[in-house]
Amino acid sequence: MSELEQLRQEAEQLRNQIQDARKACNDATLVQITSNMDSVGRIQMRTRRTLRGHLAKIYAMHWGYDSRLLVSASQDGKLIIWDSYTTNKMHAIPLRSSWVMTCAYAPSGNYVACGGLDNICSIYNLKTREGNVRVSRELPGHTGYLSCCRFLDDGQIITSSGDTTCALWDIETGQQTTTFTGHSGDVMSLSLSPDLKTFVSGACDASSKLWDIRDGMCRQSFTGHISDINAVSFFPSGYAFATGSDDATCRLFDLRADQELLLYSHDNIICGITSVAFSKSGRLLLAGYDDFNCSVWDALKGGRAGVLAGHDNRVSCLGVTDDGMAVATGSWDSFLRIWN
C-alpha cells in the first residue's frame, strides 16, 4: 500500500471519528423536537408583478434593504435597478463584460456591485451628483470567475470566486484586506451572518465553511452533500444556515450542534438547486431549481409546503425582502417575478 493511500485511510478514519463524536453529542433530532408542532399547511403564493426588460438569461438578483428596489444581472450585459412596486426601471447600467454571474445591493442603497467571468468585482455609484450611474471602483485580484459578492457597508465588500478563495476588500483603496483560503473547489456562494461578523461559503468541493471576517480564519466546516454546493443562506437567527446542491437536496446545518440537522428532498426532484433563501421568521425555506420551479419547504419539519410555478426556464436566483413581505425569483426565461 502506498504512503498516500495509507494517509488517505487515516484521514478517512479521523473523519469518521469526528462524525461519531458529533453524533454522540446529538441528544435529539430536529424531527423529534418539532413533531408536536403544527405544520405550516399549504403555502400558496401568487405572482404579483412580472419585471420585463432583460433580453437574455437572468443570472442574479439582490434586494435593496428598503424592500422595494432590487438589482438584477443578465447575460444581455445589463444591470437593472427595478422599483418592485411600480415595475419601473430606475437605472439600466450597461456592463463592460456581459458574462456577469452575481450582483449585490449595498445596505445604504448608494452602490451596487457585480462581477463574473471577467474576474473583477465592479462597484457602481447610484447617487452621483450628476445623476448618472458610473463605475466608482473595479476590484481585480481573483484569478477565477466571481461567483458571489455581498457588501458589509459602503467601504467593504466580500467576494467568492472560482479560484477557491473568498476575499474581503477595502473598496476605497481597491485592495484585498483578507483572503479566505481552505476550499478545494470553486466557491459558488456566500451568505453574511446577521451580525456581519462571520459568513458562510458553499463550494464545488461539496463542503460549506464558516469564516470569521475579523481574523480570516475558518471556524467550522460542514460536509454531507455529494455534489457541488451552489447556494448558501443564513437562518435569520444566525445560528444555522441552509445549503442547496447539485445533488438535488437542500440541507440545514446548525453552528452550535456542529452538524446537519435536516435534509430537504423529494422523490420527484432530481435536478440541482440554484438558490436558497429563508422567510423572515425562518419557518420557510425557499429553493430555486433547474426544473423551472421554486419549492417552499417547512424549514423545521422538512416537508414541502408549496411550489412557485410560473417560469419557463431554470430559476437561477431568488431573494426574500428584508421586511419579509415578498419573494423575487429570477430565471433564464429573462423575467423576474415578485410573489407573496
Swiss-Prot record:
Ranges in coiled-coil conformation: none
Repeat positions for WD: 53-92, 95-134, 141-179, 182-221, 224-263, 268-307, 310-339
Native source species: Rattus norvegicus
Gene it is expressed from: Gnb4
Annotated protein name in UniProt: Guanine nucleotide-binding protein subunit beta-4
Key words, A-Z: Acetylation, Phosphoprotein, Repeat, Transducer, WD repeat
Alphabetized GO MF terms: protein-containing complex binding; signaling receptor complex adaptor activity
GO CC terms of this entry: cell body; cytoplasm; heterotrimeric G-protein complex; synapse
Subunit annotation: G proteins are composed of 3 units, alpha, beta and gamma.
GO biological-process terms attached to the record: G protein-coupled receptor signaling pathway
Pfam families for this protein: WD40_Gbeta
Location of N-acetylserine modifications: S2
PROSITE patterns in UniProt: WD_REPEATS_1 (PS00678), WD_REPEATS_2 (PS50082), WD_REPEATS_REGION (PS50294)
Family: Belongs to the WD repeat G protein beta family.
Gene3D superfamilies per the UniProt record, alphabetical: YVTN repeat-like/Quinoprotein amine dehydrogenase
Source organism superkingdom: Eukaryota
Stated role: Guanine nucleotide-binding proteins (G proteins) are involved as a modulator or transducer in various transmembrane signaling systems. The beta and gamma chains are required for the GTPase activity, for replacement of GDP by GTP, and for G protein-effector interaction.
Phylogenetic classification of the source organism: Eukaryota, Metazoa, Chordata, Craniata, Vertebrata
Location of Phosphoserine modifications: S2
Tissue spec: Widely expressed in the brain. Highest levels found in the hippocampus and layers v and vi of the neocortex.
Phosphohistidine: modified positions: H266
